[in-house]
Amino acid sequence: MKFVRTEDLKAGMRLAKPIYNKKGVLLYERNSALTAPGIASAKNFGLIGVYILEPAEPLPPLSREDLEFEQLQTVYIFRLREVLNCITERRKLEKYPVFLEDILSHYGSLKHRVNFNQNLRSSDDFMYKHAISTAILVTMMGAHLRLPKEKLRILTTAALLYDNGYRLSLIHI
């Protein structure tokens, strides 16, 4: 499996990981062969690149939980980007409470480990995925420590927002 930038994709290449849209809807299943329209779609979707299987490489196993994590992470990246843009533009954070409750409900009662081994595609990906992974970890730890719900919300919010200065410094440099 190797990462291939969107501009270097060719028809016939097989996807190693699924591609989801910002709502978590599956666009392309893993092991799907790319087509010219699929490549154009990936470019329009704003993907920096995708993971491709080598021609003779078998499809590596992925657990249902890993696939769900990949899907949720894609949704969370778009939601976090929207939240941080609202903050930057001084707009009301109407969707933030739903986003926060989604993280708390998915990871606040989880009794098993989460595989945070993920693939970063850009500095943008790094910031968003790092903030989301930190928020998930904080949520899991806080729940394990039986922190009150309000403290858990505060900690998870801090984990999601603490890197916003890093994002803004990249924009203005």
Regions found by a protein language model. Give the residues of each.
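Acidic/His-rich, divalent-metal-binding segments that scaffold phosphate/diphosphate chemistry
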Residues: 55-170
